Amino acid sequence: MKPGEYVLADAPVVCNRGREAVELSVTNRGDRPVQVGSHFHFAEANRALDFDRQAALGCRLDIPAGTAVRLEPGDETTVKLIPLGGDRVVYGFRDMVDGSLDPHEAAGLHAAPAAPAIPARHESAAGDAPSPLKERAGFDNETR
């Protein structure tokens, strides 16, 4: 082997093999492009994105690390999400979870977890946003 030489496998590398995935339709209802990175907690993505946030809770994009998905205003696409791995503890982002995604484990309980709920203050603002193809006076894309 020479310094800097690459030795490649015969078969392609399959990322996230065996991880259960969910597909969601996402629409950017805002007036600016939105980019979401590979390891961002997708349920906490920009409020101008219209999708089922409850279904995305605890998930990230099923794309290679360090990459992102970009949605232009008015774009509708389908994304594939996989569960966050590791300890499944989330801090930061939009401050929705700030702790374990599996509350029963954090509390040391063995009972089934209650269905996690997204606080109303974090629900999508997309329902309030106009179609980017139709301008409405007084619209701004700021969070409330």
From Swiss-Prot:
The EC number(s) this enzyme carries: 3.5.1.5
Ranges of Basic and acidic residues composition bias in the record: 133-144
Low complexity bias: start-end ranges: 110-119
GO BP terms in the entry: urea catabolic process
Region: Disordered, residue numbers: 110-144
Pathway: Nitrogen metabolism; urea degradation; CO(2) and NH(3) from urea (urease route): step 1/1
Sequence similarity: Belongs to the urease beta subunit family.
Protein name in UniProt: Urease subunit beta
Organism: Micrococcus luteus (strain ATCC 4698 / DSM 20030 / JCM 1464 / CCM 169 / CCUG 5858 / IAM 1056 / NBRC 3333 / NCIMB 9278 / NCTC 2665 / VKM Ac-2230) (Micrococcus lysodeikticus)
Taxonomic placement: Bacteria, Bacillati, Actinomycetota, Actinomycetes, Micrococcales
Name of the gene this protein is made from: ureB
